[in-house]
From Swiss-Prot:
This is Pancreas/duodenum homeobox protein 1. The modification Phosphothreonine is found at residue 151. GO terms for cellular component: cytosol; nucleus. Residues 36-66, 201-283 are annotated as: Disordered. The gene is PDX1. It comes from Mesocricetus auratus (Golden hamster). Phosphorylated by the SAPK2 pathway at high intracellular glucose concentration. Phosphorylated by HIPK2 on Ser-268 upon glucose accumulation. This phosphorylation mediates subnuclear localization shifting. Phosphorylation by PASK may lead to translocation into the cytosol. Residues 146-205 bind DNA. Interacts with the basic helix-loop-helix domains of TCF3(E47) and NEUROD1 and with HMG-I(Y). Interacts with SPOP and the methyltransferase SETD7. Part of a PDX1:PBX1b:MEIS2b complex. The Antp-type hexapeptide mediates heterodimerization with PBX on a regulatory element of the somatostatin promoter. The homeodomain, which contains the nuclear localization signal, not only mediates DNA-binding, but also acts as a protein-protein interaction domain for TCF3(E47), NEUROD1 and HMG-I(Y). Pancreas; islet beta-cells.
Length: 283
């Protein structure tokens, strides 16, 4: 046991060369001890039978570093060899690609064709129709679906339609079919024409009714003025009230006594009826 303790003590002293320079009580010092800057003593050479094994181990061992140096990070050749041969060992046909296929960038992706619209009803909307009118329009719109043309009626067609509307404001289905065949029109055209014509007729009737009401209101005020004037004239033409004794002059007619004379007649007796007639002189 004593031999082993001496052996371990000797090895500790060999590994720590500063042990010979340290005192019994450690003292605080801001500077590191000088023994750290001293080179390490080389170990004794190993036996020849272990020289080959130690040589291979020293190739992968980290280099000798000082306490104030940071060792550079180097890639292990075995790990690098494993990284290079990993896809081949796993049997991958293609290496892992990025988020964009075939090396394309976000700006290089082709936009979907705008000329081919997925639904037919999208071509008849106004948003695509007006764009199709221009030469550089990106929307392929058929000419007949671009804009609905307005139906132009001839004079003969309008004459027949007006005659029919004069007799019937609302046309029946059999008569509409007959007119469509006779005028070379569709039933839809005739139906829409009658709807528009009825709206126009109703507006004209409302305008006539409003103008007649306005003229009737203006003419209704005039008779009231005339009646007021005539009533004043009648009051002026009435005879004076009878005397308090109740005696009425003999020339006043009975209608004037009762106050029922017309406005053109006066209550006073005419002088021709009161004055005596003169006898005619012989010639």
């Amino acid at each position: 046991m004593n031999g082993e303790e001496q052996y371990y003590a000797a090895t500790q002293l060999y590994k720590d060369p500063c042990a010979f320079q340290r005192g019994p009580v450690p003292e605080f010092s801001a500077n590191p001890p000088a023994c750290l800057y001293m080179g390490r003593q080389p170990p004794p050479p190993p036996p020849p039978q272990f020289a080959g094994a130690l040589g291979t181990l020293e190739q992968g061992s980290p280099p000798d570093i000082s306490p104030y140096e940071v060792p550079p990070l180097a890639e292990d050749p075995a790990v690098a060899h494993l990284h290079h041969h990993l896809p081949a060992q796993l049997g991958l046909a293609h290496p892992p690609s990025g988020p964009f296929p075939n090396g394309t960038e976000p700006g290089g992706l082709e936009e979907p064709s705008r000329g081919q619209l997925p639904f037919p009803w999208m071509k008849s909307t106004k948003a695509h129709a007006w764009k199709g009118q221009w030469a550089g329009g990106a929307y392929a719109v058929e000419p007949e679906e671009n804009k609905r043309t307005r139906t132009a009626y001839t004079r003969a067609q309008l004459l027949e339609l007006e005659k029919e509307f004069l007799f019937n404001k609302y046309i029946s289905r059999p008569r509409r079919v007959e007119l469509a065949v006779m005028l070379n029109l569709t039933e839809r055209h005739i139906k829409i024409w009658f709807q528009n014509r009825r709206m126009k007729w109703k507006k004209e009737e409302d305008k006539k009714r409003s103008s007649g009401t306005a003229s009737g209101g203006v003419g209704g005020d005039e008779p009231e003025q005339d009646s007021a004037v005539t009533s004043g004239e009648e009051l002026l033409a009435l005879p004076p009230p009878p005397p308090p004794g109740g005696a009425v002059p003999p020339g006043v007619p009975a209608a004037a006594r009762e106050g029922r004379l017309p406005p053109g007649l006066s209550a006073s007796p005419q002088p021709s009826s009161i004055a005596p007639r003169r006898p005619q002189e012989p010639r």
